[in-house]
């Protein structure tokens, strides 16, 4: 019986989930190609645009801002705050019909949460 020729394996494409993750990010395979922290920072800019407006603020968003800036306790990172308050953030964006922010929130929820 002949031994398999190792060169035959070189001709076949390798099934590498990490390489595939770079083409189509999937958090269940790898976080390669997913910028969770960067997207969370951008989302915070959307949030701040609303909550820093005195006509839109309330006690909840004041506390949220304090956590973001580290005034009420240790500073929380942006991604942690998104994870913790995703439903409140969604409600904020829905209230003010901020479709771009909602799309980014959805992306973060699917890729990072």
Curated annotation (Swiss-Prot):
Alphabetically ordered keywords of this record: Nitrogen fixation
Signal peptide: none
TM region(s), chain numbering: none
One Pfam family it belongs to: CowN
Disulfide bonds: none
GO biological process entries: nitrogen fixation
InterPro entries linked to this entry: CowN (IPR024899)
Superkingdom classification of source: Bacteria
Function: Is required to sustain N(2)-dependent growth in the presence of low levels of carbon monoxide (CO). Probably acts by protecting the N(2) fixation ability of the nitrogenase complex, which is inactivated in the presence of CO.
Membership in a protein family: Belongs to the CowN family.
Descriptive protein name: N(2)-fixation sustaining protein CowN
